[in-house]
C-alpha cells in the first residue's frame, strides 16, 4: 500500500523544521497524516475566462477540509489568446502551455502534495494542467470556470447571438459604421467565462469529460449559473475520496494514467470530431498522451476522422449556436450518448466519478436517464445580465432540446455530415500531415485548387488581405510560423476573420505551419508538418504555384514535379531554412529556449531533450 506522498515532509523527527513551516500555514497536529490536496488555480484579472476564479479555489478548499483533507492552493499563469492575438504576444501562448505544466509539477513535487484539483478554463491552461496531471500521475479532478454567455446585439432590426469573432469580422468590414462596430464590441463578451463558441478553451474543457477526468457539465454549463457551483463543491469532496482510495486502499484504478488510457484518448478525439472542436485540441491531446506515455498519434486521429460523423455544429461553424445551446441539448454527455448508440465509443473506460463511462451515460445522458435532477441541471440557462461574478444567476430554460433529428445535437442517422468535423490531410507539402476543421468548411470548397500567395509571416498576410491584394481563387500560404519557426506557433484568427470580412471565406484557402484559433472557420489548413523551419516543403512553395486540396480524399498537393522540388530544396538548404525577409519580431531568450527543444505540430509540439 503506497504511503501518502506528503508523509515525506510531515513525519519523522528530522522533519521538525518542515512541520514548523506547515504549522505556519495553519496546519495543526491532527492534520499531519491527512492527504494534502493541491488546489491548482489559474485566477488572473487579465483573462475573462479566469477573472471569476479568485474565490473558487477557497470554495473547493473548504470542501476538501470538510471531507478530511488538507487543502493548499497555488496559482499558475494564464494567457488570453484573444488579447495576445495580432501582435508578438501570441508568440508566448503555446509556450505557456509547457510553462504551466512545469509550474504545476514544480509546486506539487516540491511540496509532496498527494492529489490535485485543477481549476482551469482557457486555451493553454487546461492543456498545461492536463499534461502535468499525466506527468505526475497522482489523483486529480478537473473543474473549469465555464463558458461565457453568448452576446446579444440588436442589429438592423433583428436580435442575434454573437461572440468575439463576430466583433472581429465586422470591425474589418467597411460596410459597418463605427457605431455598429462599437455595439458589437460592447456586446460580444458580456460575462466572465471562456469565449462562448466551440473554440479551443471550451473544446478542451469538453474533452476532459470524455477523458473521464472531470464531472458531467464541466464543458457546457455557463460560468454564471448557480448550478456550476455544484461542480466545484463536488470536486472538493471527490478528490479526498480518490486520494484515500489510492493511498489507503491501494486502488490505482483512479490514477490519471489508469483513466486516460489510449481508449479514453480515442474517445476524446471521437468527441472532438463529432462536435467540430478546435484544431488546437489535436496539439493538446497529442501532448497529453505523450506525457501519459500513451501511443496516440496522428494516424489514430486520421483513422477516427474517416468514420466519425458531425453530430453538433457550434459557433464558429454555426454562428447562432453557442455552448449554452449545447448544454440545453444535454451537453457533452448527450453527444457521447449518441456516439455510444452509434457504436463509436469504448464505454468500458473508467471515470473519476463513475466506475465506467457507460455508468456515467446511464445517469447523465438526457435521452436515457429519467432523473429529474439531471433534466433540471441541463435546463440551466444564461442569465442575460453582464457580470464578472460566478454563479450569479439561477435562470432555467422551460424545456430541454431533445430533438435528435433537427436539434443542436443530432443522432448519427441525422448527422450534419457523415464525415467528421476534423480531417488529417497528407501530401507532398505535408508529409507528416496537417489539420483542417471540416465542420467550418463550406461544402462547395471541400475540393479546391488555387494559386499560392506566399507570406513569410502572419503580419505580411494580414497586410495583404486588408490591402485587397488577395483575390478569389488564391491560396494564402503563411510559413515560418510553426512551433520552432515562429517561434511559438501563432494562431491565425485575424487572417481567417479578415478573409471572411472581405467576402472571401468561401473563395480562398489558407495553408500554414502555424495554427488556428478555435474561432477560425473556412478552408483553413494548419499544423503543416514538417514546418518550414525544419525543412518542410511548405518552405519551398513559390508565388504562382498551384495547390490542390481534396478534403474528401484527405490530400493536399503542391503541383510541381519531383525534379523541381528537389532543385528548390537544394537551393533553400544552401541559404538556410529561415524567412526570405527579416521580420520585425523580437524573440526573447525564453522563446529561443522554447524553439530549441520543441517538436513539430504532428507530435503535439512537445519538448524533446
Swiss-Prot record:
State the Pfam families in the record.
ILV_EDD_C (PF24877), ILVD_EDD_N (PF00920)
Its annotated pathway?
Answer: Amino-acid biosynthesis; L-isoleucine biosynthesis; L-isoleucine from 2-oxobutanoate: step 3/4; Amino-acid biosynthesis; L-valine biosynthesis; L-valine from pyruvate: step 3/4
Give one GO molecular function term: dihydroxy-acid dehydratase activity
Can you tell me which residues bind [2Fe-2S] cluster? 122, 195
A GO biological process this protein is involved in?
isoleucine biosynthetic process
Listed SUPFAM superfamilies: IlvD/EDD N-terminal domain-like (SSF143975), LeuD/IlvD-like (SSF52016)
On this chain, the residues bearing N6-carboxylysine are: 124
Q: Which InterPro entries match?
A: Dihydro-acid_dehy_C, DihydroxyA_deHydtase, DiOHA_6PGluconate_deHydtase_CS, ILV_EDD_C, ILV_EDD_N, IlvD/EDD_N
- Which sites bind Mg(2+)? 81, 123-124, 491
According to UniProt, the reaction catalysed is: (2R)-2,3-dihydroxy-3-methylbutanoate = 3-methyl-2-oxobutanoate + H2O; (2R,3R)-2,3-dihydroxy-3-methylpentanoate = (S)-3-methyl-2-oxopentanoate + H2O
Q: Which cofactor does it need?
A: [2Fe-2S] cluster; Mg(2+)
The record's annotation in HAMAP family points to: IlvD (MF_00012)
Q: What does this protein do?
A: Functions in the biosynthesis of branched-chain amino acids. Catalyzes the dehydration of (2R,3R)-2,3-dihydroxy-3-methylpentanoate (2,3-dihydroxy-3-methylvalerate) into 2-oxo-3-methylpentanoate (2-oxo-3-methylvalerate) and of (2R)-2,3-dihydroxy-3-methylbutanoate (2,3-dihydroxyisovalerate) into 2-oxo-3-methylbutanoate (2-oxoisovalerate), the penultimate precursor to L-isoleucine and L-valine, respectively.
Q: Which NCBIfam families match?
A: ilvD, PRK12448.1
From the Swiss-Prot or TrEMBL record, give the protein name.
Dihydroxy-acid dehydratase
- Gene responsible for this protein: ilvD
